[in-house]
């Protein structure tokens, strides 16, 4: 049985990247929360 996490850069960016986050209201909220928390890395 193979492991469940098979990392791919393209898929990671497409699903969790900054531009995708900025497209939806909830995504923008994610960015806002992470900025408020002081996260060094906002998105994948």
Curated annotation (Swiss-Prot):
InterPro entries: Ribosomal_bL34 (IPR000271), Ribosomal_bL34_CS (IPR020939). GO terms for molecular function: structural constituent of ribosome. It comes from the Bacteria. It holds the Pfam family Ribosomal_L34. The keyword Flavoprotein does not apply. One of its GO terms (biological process) is translation. Keywords: Ribonucleoprotein, Ribosomal protein. One of its GO terms (cellular component) is ribosome. HAMAP family: Ribosomal_bL34 (MF_00391). Belongs to the bacterial ribosomal protein bL34 family. This is Large ribosomal subunit protein bL34. It comes from Desulforudis audaxviator (strain MP104C).
């Amino acid at each position: 049985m193979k492991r469940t996490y098979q990392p791919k850069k393209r898929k990671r960016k497409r699903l969790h990247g900054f531009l995708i986050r900025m497209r939806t209201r909830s995504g923008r909220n994610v960015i806002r929360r992470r900025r408020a928390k002081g996260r060094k890395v906002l998105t994948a």
